[in-house]
Design a protein with these regions (language model features):
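A short, internal acetyl-CoA/4′-phosphopantetheine-binding micro-motif in the GNAT/acyltransferase core
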Residues: 71-83, 229-238
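Conserved GNAT acetyl-CoA-binding A-motif
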Residues: 98-109, 254-264
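Conserved acyl-donor/pantetheine-binding loop and adjacent beta-alpha core of acyl/acetyltransferases
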Residues: 61-72
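Generic structural signal for hydrophobic
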Residues: 96-97, 150, 193, 253
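A short, structural micro-pattern
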Residues: 51, 69, 99, 123-126
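A conserved beta-strand-loop-helix scaffold within acyl/acetyltransferase catalytic domains
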Residues: 2-48, 56-63, 107-129, 135-235
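Terminal substrate-recognition subdomain of acyl/acetyltransferases
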Residues: 109-153, 265-309
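Aromatic (often tryptophan-rich) hydrophobic motifs at membrane interfaces
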Residues: 87-92, 191, 198-300
Length: 309
């Protein structure tokens, strides 16, 4: 049975079974939902008194989707054998399909039920990102050259001391990428995350002038740092800045005991080519989309064809 539970029950559930990602944490989820005006629900599948799986969802109207493009759908496995969890997941999604007309999920790397989603009528698209192990900060020669050049040009790196100034630079470089987003809303969101130690901005200066910034998201549960957004200055004037900022971020979080850096995307060839130079591992994840109106139209079309025959 799929049960909707409150935040207190969810917190109890993940305290027992949730050795997972940042994306199951009620504080993170609540900040995200409140800031973007989304609904938030927590679900647990039970068999008798046994809890089998659980997950949170964001929704708007009759659509399940995340307000941001970096939030993964987190599935928490509890009791039972793998077959029970598999069936529980299928039954849970079938239940959600009856309640919502559209479902859009970004699946975690190595999500185990891709075929099950396809069998449930989801269109599953494969995407890529680079994951860099922080115990080995070995890069391509090109990256090392850029870092060495930057070190010779009086650049300095530090944690941001002015969120507003740093965020403004990031926004100007990424507002096309964040199409449809409201600057005030995004500003408020990341400001709240930083106050809760879920996010941080790293700055690069030259002779006192603020040149560029990198916004990262910290998953302290899994010891993963996500290099989410970077401001991009004039590349002809500052060709080595991005390499130095990424290296600073990875070195900093290595010193904090983090294990991995997710370089956040490798789906555009120009971006993937640059990120590949940090010698990370290319990993796959999926977007899964279900739209009931689409399948209703397909069914109607098939029925018309059958009638003709």
């Amino acid at each position: 049975m799929l049960l909707e539970v409150d935040e207190l029950k969810w917190s109890e559930f993940i305290s027992v079974y949730g050795k997972g990602s940042l994306f199951i944490e009620p504080v993170w989820l609540s900040i995200t939902a409140t800031n973007f005006g989304y609904g938030l629900k927590y679900y647990i599948w039970t068999e008798g008194t046994e809890e089998v799986i659980g997950f949170p969802i964001f929704y708007k109207g009759k659509t399940i989707k995340s307000p941001t493009n970096f939030h993964f759908f987190p599935l928490v496995k509890a009791k039972g054998i793998e077959k029970q969890k598999n069936i529980a997941f299928i039954r849970s999604i079938e239940n959600l399909k009856r309640r919502f007309g559209s479902i859009r999920l970004k699946m975690e790397i190595d999500f185990p039920y891709q075929k099950e989603l396809e069998g449930l009528g989801f269109n599953v698209t494969e995407k890529f990102t680079y994951i860099k192990r922080l115990d080995n900060l070995n890069y391509s020669r090109n990256i090392f050259r850029m870092i060495k050049k930057a070190e010779q040009q009086s650049y300095t790196t530090s944690l941001s001391t002015s969120f507003e100034s740093s965020f403004s630079k990031i926004w100007e470089s990424n507002k096309g990428y964040l199409l449809g987003s409201n600057k005030k809303q995004i500003f408020s969101f990341f400001s709240a995350l930083i106050k809760k130690n879920f996010s941080q901005i790293l700055d690069l200066h030259q002779d006192g002038a603020h040149i560029a910034s990198l916004l990262v998201i910290e998953d302290q549960n899994q010891k993963v740092v996500y290099t989410y957004l970077i401001s991009i200055p004039d590349r002809k004037k500052y060709p080595e800045v991005q390499a130095m900022l990424y290296n600073y971020g990875m070195s900093l979080y290595k010193s904090k005991g983090f294990l991995f850096c997710d370089l956040c995307g490798a789906n555009l060839s120009s971006i993937a080519k640059f990120k590949a130079k940090f010698n990370g591992d290319l990993e796959r994840y999926q977007y899964a989309v279900y739209n009931s109106s689409y399948f209703i139209k397909i069914e109607e079309y098939i029925k018309k064809l059958i009638r003709r025959w």
